[in-house]
Amino acid sequence: MSNKVLSCLISLFLLGAGVAKAQMGDQTSIGPRIGVNFSNVSNIEGSKSLTGLVLGLTSTYSITEATGLTVDLLYSQEGYSLNDVDLRLNYLQLPIYFDLFFGELGDKFRPKVYAGIVPGILLSAKNGDAKVDNDFFNTVNFAVSGGLGFNLRMSSRVWLNTDLRAYLGLNDIRDKSLQDGDKNANSTIQLSVGVAYGLSKI
């Protein structure tokens, strides 16, 4: 199942990017994103925040001068620390956001706020240095997310993007057979930077 979901997420991102380039190039940008996660899991007494890596691709389509749609494809390390042991959950995520931009279209500096959903699948899990069987965890993870940031124009078609995001998991990270009433859901604060390149129509 996880392989099918993984293929679906990647295909959706690539299909969207291809359609954007072919039909909406003048309003579309795409590029790399990298950052850091500060994550934890709810209802685990004594758990502490875990620092992890996030990296991947980001794309934005400008619907109007003030609104847009952002779709990312990200490798995201989440989890928590308990008794000096880190439980790390590595996900492939497809964040989808509706963006609201401030200022004018041609401005060099444009603040933004956004909100959306984050479907993802579990790629692997580690408890300390030991790999943990994925069967102990929920393969599919959903979250709601919001954030703020700014886009800084570096040239006519290149932008530096800085983002601060919050993720709130909607489902238990554990497999259904291990759930006992109190939901253990991911919660993450993410700080990232990216470079977006404007596409031209074919």
Model-found features: residue ranges?
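Cleavable N-terminal export/targeting peptides
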Residues: M1-D26, S200-I202
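Short glycine/proline- and aromatic-enriched beta-strand/turn motifs that initiate or cap beta-hairpins
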Residues: K21-Y61, A196-I202
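Residues that define the transmembrane beta-barrel architecture of outer-membrane proteins
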Residues: D26-I30, S49-L53, R88-L94, F109, ...
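Transmembrane beta-barrel strands of outer-membrane/channel proteins
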Residues: P32-F38, V71-Y75, F98, V113-I121, ...
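Outer-membrane beta-barrel "beta-signal"
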Residues: R33, P95-D99, A185-I202
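Outer-membrane beta-barrel translocator domains and adjoining extracellular loop/strand segments
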Residues: S42-K48, S81-D86, S124-V132, I173-Q179
